[in-house]
Amino acid sequence: MYKSIFKTTGRLGKTVSSRNFVTTLPKPLATSSSPATNAPNKTSNPKTGELHVSTPVDTAKISIEPPEGSSISLKSASRDASLFGTRPIYLDVQATTPVDPRVLDKMLEFYTGLYGNPHSSTHAYGWETDKEVEKARTYIADVINADPKEIIFTSGATETNNMAIKGVPRFYKKTKKHIITTQTEHKCVLDSARHMQDEGFEVTYLPVSSEGLINLDDLKKAIRKDTVLVSIMAVNNEIGVIQPLKEIGKICRENKVFFHTDAAQAYGKIPIDVNEMNIDLLSISSHKIYGPKGIGACYVRRRPRVRLDPIITGGGQERGLRSGTLAPPLVAGFGEAARLMKQESSFDKRHIEKLSSKLKNGLLSIPSTQFNGCNDAKSQYPGCVNVSFAYIEGESLLMALKDIALSSGSACTSASLEPSYVLHALGADDALAHSSIRFGIGRFTTEAEVDYVIQAINERVDFLRKMSPLWEMVQEGIDLNTIEWSGH
């Protein structure tokens, strides 16, 4: 249960007063006149703690109560946030998650009282801050059954991935010059691998099945005597596929190859035991687990020891692997977010699975839709639902859904109009890849929001398809594959 009651609206778009949210949403506006609707705004009833959606924002109705134990009122800050305008429903948690109010409450004291440099060992200000940093390090390690000394703080998962994929091969470059990864990794992994190719390393990019999973036999065949590192992500950021980490770790350990996994989308969301799974390096991101942005971590195994060249050098902080003064507010927030992920795991799992099932079934009831991912529940993270809507471009649908915050792929590449390389790797053609939308469900998503999204998607897909000549031909029974387009 929430120990601190934090009622807030505005940018978070939620009122947290208990484990349950009561949400009232408007019906989607008819799309015959315009495919886009006014974005709904969330405001709260201070008496009931219920969350309501209305348009436009009425700041006079916003009621903010600071969390218990907080010495600062956040009322003004939230009112300022509401001035940014109406807030759409947020279903893009793979890109980032809202900061949990309890995490924010934990961070505030480091801006007002505990402001010492954790590396200052000559006075109490440094000692008390260092104590809190180590406490956070322990919380983060506990989630993956690691030793706190194996947690190295970084600026985020991108830096951590660079640190692992560049640092390990560089340290062992005299004897080992081969790296293995997959075609569906995050861009920062693929770009780091290509960078190592420029340095003279050979890289093998493993293919995946139509459901996004690697073939373990392909991995076994790809490993060579000079293979230094295997980097395979735990949960894909676009389609939510879970790779068989335990089996991969076993193969790597048997062949004396280091195993790195990008767990930015998996940490705290699926069970991970670095010892049982033989994981040597693991990337973590705070802002994917309802923590602050700008902080992450790299798990680096101590026994058997993993050696790597540091990317950032200087003062020798973080065991000499990542120099630079730590930011105690971010570290403390990260630690609290990790503690809550472990504490709330059973609730989050039930909540997300329930809403995911409802959303997936509702979307796939629309004609000519396709789920992108794995149909085996054991290999699919339910919080990520990627669906292709045939005969519609994903960008067009996103423009028609201004009242819902969604993505057509990775947030790091969403500005590009190129079709998803992840879906291409699954065998999807350009048209299908272009028509995909990623829906993300998280801790603060409500059932009422999912109901609203299903209805809105149904109406606007129908509206856009009525403007598509291809859809009209399909409705008339014409097989598009039989048409010789070059002759028209």
Curated annotation (Swiss-Prot):
It holds the Pfam family Aminotran_5. The modification N6-(pyridoxal phosphate)lysine is found at K288. Its main location: mitochondrion. Pyridoxal 5'-phosphate binds at A157, T158, N237, Q265, S285, S286, H287, T325. Its EC number is 2.8.1.7. Keywords: Iron, Iron-sulfur, Metal-binding, Mitochondrion, Pyridoxal phosphate, Transferase, Transit peptide, tRNA processing. GO terms for molecular function: cystathionine gamma-lyase activity; cysteine desulfurase activity; iron-sulfur cluster binding; metal ion binding; pyridoxal phosphate binding. InterPro entries: Aminotrans_V_dom, Aminotrans_V_PyrdxlP_BS, Cys_deSase_IscS, PyrdxlP-dep_Trfase, PyrdxlP-dep_Trfase_major, PyrdxlP-dep_Trfase_small. GO terms for biological process: [2Fe-2S] cluster assembly; intracellular iron ion homeostasis; iron-sulfur cluster assembly; mitochondrial tRNA thio-modification; tRNA wobble position uridine thiolation. GO terms for cellular component: cytosol; L-cysteine desulfurase complex; mitochondrion; nucleus. [2Fe-2S] cluster binds at C412. It is an enzyme of class 2 (transferase). The active site is at C412. Its cofactor is pyridoxal 5'-phosphate. It catalyses: (sulfur carrier)-H + L-cysteine = (sulfur carrier)-SH + L-alanine. Belongs to the class-V pyridoxal-phosphate-dependent aminotransferase family. NifS/IscS subfamily. This is Cysteine desulfurase, mitochondrial. It comes from Candida albicans (strain SC5314 / ATCC MYA-2876).
